Amino acid sequence: MLDFEKPLFEIRNKIDSLKESQEKNEVDLQDEIDMLEASLKRETTKVYTNLKPWDRVQIARLPERPTTLDYIPYIFDSFIELHGDRSFRDDPAMIGGIGYLDGKSVTVIGQQRGKDTKDNIYRNFGMAHPEGYRKALRLMKQAEKFNRPIFTFIDTKGAYPGKAAEERGQSESIAKNLMEMASLTVPVIAVVIGEGGSGGALGIGISNRVLMLENSTYSVISPEGAAALLWKDSNLAQIAAETMKITAHDLLDLGIIDEVINEPLGGAQKDEEAQALSIKKMFLKHLNELKQLTPEELANDRFEKFRKIGSVVE
């Protein structure tokens, strides 16, 4: 239960208590139950239509929030995962492969979090090593060779900052991805489905279109990290989240992203299939627009999109 959900939790408890009493004591409490359920529906709508940035950060971090591998079966047909960077090893924190979207062959890449402690250790909590980014780039260049559109799912706190990752060239691998992605001659569409953290997110995020689920975040640093750097107090993370403009609607207003994808009431985890189908609909919409561009126009469109971010007109 998240902090802002406490009022809803209390109403649910009352409903459960009345249902239990009704069943145990064989008394008719249905009118009271119906009133509380109507109240719960109203309050749920009120809460989730007035979320603060910090509330959305909490939703984006929910362990039960759908991951890349949860969405893929609903969006792509006949997906086959491909492994390895051909230099060191495979990285389970970065998955990728080929499949079909609406009958067309495509390449799919995404960061992958775990579902439980064991899985998170295997997936390194969704924080990719250099080999993960090199695998992603290998699949992107393969997609370019065979003229396949590329779809990426961004869902990471950031690239793994460990000693071994740095020794194997973490910064170089991300920098190379940024450079190579900028000049790809096929459509590239990215969607932020959870946390989009720093260079770890950008390493697969240089795309013609950047989409975000409405309760996802996209930032250069976590709110806790920003608060610690700016005010020497990570407890001020809520204020940092407000200041940083890391939510989907803020970033749309700033021109950083191209479209916000609505989530089911309560978050994507409430209806995984419906959320996946919403993502698929947006993928098809933007792909159809990008198909009108030549290979050179696609590369120029992507380059200019990111080149103008942060520009100031006096």
UniProtKB/Swiss-Prot annotation:
GO BP, sorted A to Z: fatty acid biosynthetic process; malonyl-CoA biosynthetic process
Molecular functions per Gene Ontology: acetyl-CoA carboxylase activity; ATP binding; carboxyl- or carbamoyltransferase activity
GO CC entries: acetyl-CoA carboxylase complex
SUPFAM superfamilies named in the record: ClpP/crotonase
Catalytic activity entry: N(6)-carboxybiotinyl-L-lysyl-[protein] + acetyl-CoA = N(6)-biotinyl-L-lysyl-[protein] + malonyl-CoA
Pathway assignment: Lipid metabolism; malonyl-CoA biosynthesis; malonyl-CoA from acetyl-CoA: step 1/1
EC number: 2.1.3.15
Span of domain CoA carboxyltransferase C-terminal: 32-289
Top-rank EC class of the record's enzyme: transferase
UniProt keyword list: ATP-binding, Cytoplasm, Fatty acid biosynthesis, Fatty acid metabolism, Lipid biosynthesis, Lipid metabolism, Nucleotide-binding, Transferase
Superkingdom classification of source: Bacteria
Location(s), subcellular: Cytoplasm
Cross-referenced NCBIfam families: accA, AccA_sub, PRK05724.1
Assigned protein family: Belongs to the AccA family.
Role this protein plays: Component of the acetyl coenzyme A carboxylase (ACC) complex. First, biotin carboxylase catalyzes the carboxylation of biotin on its carrier protein (BCCP) and then the CO(2) group is transferred by the carboxyltransferase to acetyl-CoA to form malonyl-CoA.
HAMAP family: AcetylCoA_CT_alpha (MF_00823)
Subunit structure: Acetyl-CoA carboxylase is a heterohexamer composed of biotin carboxyl carrier protein (AccB), biotin carboxylase (AccC) and two subunits each of ACCase subunit alpha (AccA) and ACCase subunit beta (AccD).
Descriptive protein name: Acetyl-coenzyme A carboxylase carboxyl transferase subunit alpha
